[in-house]
Amino acid sequence: MQNTVLRLRTSTCHVTRQRLLFFVSGVALSALVLQKDTAEAQETNASTVLQPIVVQGTAATKGARVEQRGYVATQSASATKITTAISETPQSVSVVTRGAMTDRAVQTVADSLLYSANVNGQRYGNDPRSDYFSIRGFGADLYLDGLRVPQIANQTGGYAGFRVEPYFLNRVEVLRGPSSALFGQTNVGGVVNMISKDPSETAGGEVYTRFGSYKQKEAGFDVTGPLGADSDLTYRLEGIIRDSETMNDFGKNDRFAISPTVRWSPDEDTSLTVYGAYMKDDAGQVPSLIPAVGSIYPNRLGLTIPRSFSDGDPSLAIYDKETAYTGYRLEHAFNDDLVLRQNFRYSYLDVNYQNLFGNGLSANQRTLSRLVYNAQPTLNAVALDTNLEYRFDSGPISHTLLGGIDVQWQNLVNRTGSRSGPTLDLFNPGYGIGVQPAALTTHLDQTQRQVGFYLQDQMELGGLRLTVGGRQDYVSNDSDSTALASGLTTRYRQDDSAFTGRVGAAYVFDNGLVPYALYSTSFSPVLTLTPTPLKPTKGELKEVGVKFAPQGDDFSLTLSGFEATQQNVVNRVASVYYQTDEVRVRGIELEANATLWDSLNLTAAASWQDPVVTESQTPAQIGKMPYTVPKQQQSLFVSYDLPMPDSWNGKLTLGAGVRRIGRTAGDTANSFFVPGYTLVDAFARYEHDRYSFQLNGYNLGDKTYVAGCNTPTQCYYGQGLTVVGTVSVKW
């Protein structure tokens, strides 16, 4: 139902950035002061390094939070909300450990996923505003410690997207396939669940400096330990500051981020973790939108658009973003069989986005038309999840029952305006022309509320593992769109509800072989930057596979075949979102991780899939490939600790990786295709006592390639050769 009223509604929830920053800074200052007392109270050794976390809390979840140097993880909490052996989980799960992230010197969450099976980690190149990635050809959902990170249009990325700092993370887990039966809002492709570093009972710390390509200068720190001798309080304080340019002229990749965490553990059955984070980003001119002609295909003039080309202007190159979140995680075990958990987080985002970008190419194939765009989004979000875990036996069957309720609330206020801008010569650009910002013309106020009730039973009978779960969701979406010139408001109201379920079975053989099968459904309401609400996405997954973990912590392999179908798939062209009726993806995936001889780590992945539009209101799109979805991907990353003479008193580690992304469709009509590409990365690290010296290189061949396209005039170059050096000191 739609009506028009003369009223402008503002956000119903507002917490000032100054108060959030005051909160974060206060906790940080307290932790730093108490660190001095802790250091004096403990006997230290100069050769001691930052120890792996001694996890406090209940056994139900601590296994998935332990820091790991190797590449093989054995447990995950993403698939079931309870720490479960990955090999016994009837679903494809990957874990990128802290050790793997350190070896690759990842600077974004998307970077950490570049070697995971069937994850396209840079579908639009390297964008300092947000992380863009997809799983199995569908937009992925982003979670932090089991709670959903606010997202626009059910996709990571976008100019109003959160970008969590990877230095604050212990691991990144990839759950392929929907998890709506537990988490609620998830796409059929899967979930990326980021696990934060926890405070440690052992005092330690790290400081580092980093220099690299594009004039990058960065420094960071991570300190942790108990808050006083014999204290039941522990803390962790992390922070980074970066000043950097980007591949594109007038682009920036500046960041300041800080994250304090305090944990109270009065006994072995109870823990309360209170945390916060504040991040401020300055991206300047956003990555360039370039035409396919002159980048993928030859220009009739015989000219190629350089990678450093900017479609903007330094007089209007503004992208400033502030994000913050704070919350708590509570666990209490009443006894060995009954555990209560509650997870709460409040999130805030504010963006000032004023840019000039390309949106068309003239017939002469060198004159670029441009759009002046102005957006001022503010997002407030609250998430609360409460559940009970109960373990019991019914005859020969062991049960782990999980039931709970979660509540999610999001309010997005976005003021936008746009107009045609001055044209630009692709091959002889003139900059510094004094472009004025576009006037704001529209005020959008959207509020989304969701309540979900879920129940899951994990059953064991001998080697059989059976997981059955279901969830009922109720969602409302209120949207007011006001024309600022007239004051007229158009109001939309949308209510939805859905039941989603999951049934999975696996059989654990003594030799480590685990065949499994899974059926799961998904449901996800959509919050957008446009006035008219989009339909919720719905999907289903059928998956069979086999896992092999013969040596416990040393080796793991997963081979899976799947068919994923999703209705109302959300797509994006520039800042406009629209939906495709139905997309189906059938595929095969293989991923292996190994830690051998305590010196060799490797991760290998390969995927082959057939993505196709099966239903559309535009008949010509049926049978076509969705854009930015590769049919195949392969990758391999290996690191090796070289034997060193005892006299060196150090360790030398060398590593290298190769990743291949197959060709993708460049638009919905499949009128052209983006060629596939192969990239090589490498690193070397020397560790001596408390000191570490590391050098990383990405795209060592300096290959020029296009990462993806939405239309013939909206393509994105991939990152060129990038070199980064890091020096760190641990204690």
Regions found by a protein language model. Name each.
Residues 282-295, 411-414, 502-548, 553-580, ...:
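Surface-exposed extracellular loop regions of Gram-negative outer-membrane beta-barrel proteins
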Residues 331-333, 337-345, 349-355, 536-598, ...:
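Membrane-embedded beta-barrel scaffold of Gram-negative outer-membrane proteins
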Residues 2, 659-667, 685-731:
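C-terminal beta-signal and adjacent terminal beta-strands/loops
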Residues 51-202, 544:
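Acidic, small-polar-rich N-terminal luminal/periplasmic segments of exported/outer-membrane proteins
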Residues 263-267, 379, 398-402, 406-408, ...:
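Structural signature of Gram-negative outer-membrane beta-barrels, strongest in the C-terminal barrel
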Residues 563, 580-668, 701, 726-730:
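Gram-negative outer-membrane beta-barrel transporters
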Residues 242-246, 258-333, 348-379, 422-450:
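Acidic/polar loop-and-plug regions of large Gram-negative outer-membrane beta-barrel proteins
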Residues 151, 167-170, 181-258, 266-270, ...:
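Outer-membrane beta-barrel translocator/receptor signature
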